[in-house]
């Protein structure tokens, strides 16, 4: 696509883009709620709360459970969530189809690859390692590495500086409006994926430069051979 001809690097969101992490997140939230005598929300509902970081995830869970928000309750529930998620993050997460093969092709073509996630930083590296994709990333920016998270463009500015790229040279790929808003605010071209966690909204409503239904479609979108072509 002409709009992606200047691309010299690609950055990705994590949850809902590279990794289906809803099962592990839901288990941790439900155990944190149960510890306080509250009902379990379940994976289908928790998946609609993903994308703004752990604090917001906890706040949404407490609001759903009908508990009044206060700093002490949020802090206590967040501590419980962290405790349980440390046990569920790896076994409760799996790569979406063709993610690893696509990352491998991007790397083979000399493109630096970055990761920008609102997920708490301590959980990121162990998850990437367990899934076998950690070595593909030149720069990883977690939720604790910046003062403000996506949809603010600050994490993208930080990544651009670390990679030495101009905004127009870095493609950002994500599954939620927070990803698209952050990319647009930073001046980066962006691709929205239809299969992730976007609060029940179609990603097209956020007006990314391109919408893809399959992760591997990224390769031909930026002018590289598709995985099928490489198998011939």
UniProtKB/Swiss-Prot annotation:
Keywords: Carbohydrate metabolism, Chloride, Hydrolase, Magnesium, Metal-binding. CDD domains: HAD_PGPase (cd16417). GO terms for biological process: carbohydrate metabolic process; DNA repair; glycolate biosynthetic process. GO terms for cellular component: cytosol. GO terms for molecular function: metal ion binding; phosphoglycolate phosphatase activity. Transmembrane segments: none annotated. Its cofactor is Mg(2+); chloride. Coiled coil: none annotated. It is an enzyme of class 3 (hydrolase). It catalyses: 2-phosphoglycolate + H2O = glycolate + phosphate. Mg(2+) binds at residues 13, 15, 175. The active site is at 13 (nucleophile). Specifically catalyzes the dephosphorylation of 2-phosphoglycolate. Is involved in the dissimilation of the intracellular 2-phosphoglycolate formed during the DNA repair of 3'-phosphoglycolate ends, a major class of DNA lesions induced by oxidative stress. Belongs to the HAD-like hydrolase superfamily. CbbY/CbbZ/Gph/YieH family. This is Phosphoglycolate phosphatase.
């Amino acid at each position: 696509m002409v709009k992606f001809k200047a691309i010299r690097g690609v950055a990705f969101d994590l949850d809902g883009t590279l990794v289906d992490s809803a099962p592990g997140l839901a288990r941790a939230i439900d155990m944190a709620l149960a510890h306080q005598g509250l009902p379990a929300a379940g994976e289908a509902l928790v998946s609609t709360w993903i994308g703004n970081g752990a604090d917001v995830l906890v706040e949404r869970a407490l609001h759903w459970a009908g508990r009044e928000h206060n700093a002490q309750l949020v802090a206590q529930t967040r501590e419980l969530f962290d405790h349980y998620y440390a046990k569920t993050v790896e076994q409760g997460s799996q790569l979406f189809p063709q993610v690893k093969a696509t990352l491998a092709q991007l790397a083979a073509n000399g493109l630096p690859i970055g990761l920008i996630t609102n997920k708490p930083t301590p959980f990121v590296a162990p998850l990437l390692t367990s899934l076998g994709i950690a070595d593909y990333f030149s720069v990883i920016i977690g939720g604790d590495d910046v003062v403000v998270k996506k949809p603010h463009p600050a994490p993208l500015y930080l990544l651009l500086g670390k990679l030495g790229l101009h905004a127009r040279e870095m493609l950002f790929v994500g599954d939620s409006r927070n990803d698209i808003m952050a990319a647009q605010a930073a001046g980066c071209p962006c691709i929205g994926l239809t299969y992730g966690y976007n609060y029940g909204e179609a990603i097209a409503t956020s007006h990314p430069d391109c919408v893809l239904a399959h992760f591997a479609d990224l390769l031909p979108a930026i002018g590289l051979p598709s995985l099928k072509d490489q198998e011939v």
